[in-house]
């Protein structure tokens, strides 16, 4: 093990002792915010320190076996123990490297998923609806809750734009690499000649902002307009100004919510989405800088990047960032995303390991 890696692990072991001492103090118990932060830190430290202690135990066993090599009666057994121990040390060191990877503090959070129709008109809007159904099915299989925050339906079905909140432990960590341009190649329902058309949608995945600490929104930076809600296809039209449009003047970000009959609830939803967008803007600027430095393939924060193609005639889905092609389009559109999300996460960890090896 590299001395720098050992030193880092020793620091974490020492920090765990400090955190345990702090959690035992009466002052900490009286401050719930501090108690929660320390408890979260302890939960992250404990598995790393436990794995390091196990590693040290195996290392000590190998050292003891090496001392036994000089005894002719014990030499054969000692050689076996050394061989087995060194193999375990190699495995444990690889596992410790994974545990040392920087954790995204947002991975455990719920998220806002925004899908916008792009090139392709009505067909693009229909595909937006298909993507929403795909993500909703995936969320349901994992026991997450999906709530529509805002929607703008198209005349033929689907959505010009739709924003949903996906509430569940680890939702953002699993879906954060879905941001980008999704391209579909298929024969549209409106195509009489049977020709294949190409259209695209843009997906944005944003972690839910912590109202207490993540984003501070100055009320004087907001312009709030109310108007009467309306819907496509003969939906009800409110007779009161229940719809809300919030503009964040410094950034120009605009959020509209009109799905609820209550103006107060629409305003609450719009503020949640605005906070997530502001947090997302900060994150993407940081990720773009880091990606340029690391030459990262995924997680660059670039929403215009074409990340995936769904080819219906061939029944295939291709993720262009990792050159992965799966011939299971129907299952994927029904929400079977684990193979895709797992491969993206593995690639991200490989990039992190390469960077960690460079830094340690």
Curated annotation (Swiss-Prot):
Family assignment from sequence similarity: Belongs to the prokaryotic/mitochondrial release factor family.
The protein's name in its UniProt record: Peptide chain release factor 1
Function: Peptide chain release factor 1 directs the termination of translation in response to the peptide chain termination codons UAG and UAA.
Gene: prfA
Posttranslational mods: Methylated by PrmC. Methylation increases the termination efficiency of RF1.
InterPro entries for this protein: PCRF (IPR005139), Pep_chain_release_fac_I (IPR000352), Pep_chain_release_fac_I_sf (IPR045853), Prokaryotic/Mito_RF (IPR050057), RF-1 (IPR004373)
Residue numbers carrying N5-methylglutamine: 235
GO CC annotation, single: cytoplasm
Main localization (coarse): cytoplasm
Key words of the record: Cytoplasm, Methylation, Protein biosynthesis
Compartments reported by the entry: Cytoplasm
GO MF, any single term: translation release factor activity, codon specific
Organism: Bordetella parapertussis (strain 12822 / ATCC BAA-587 / NCTC 13253)
Superkingdom as given in the UniProt entry: Bacteria
Extent of the signal sequence: none
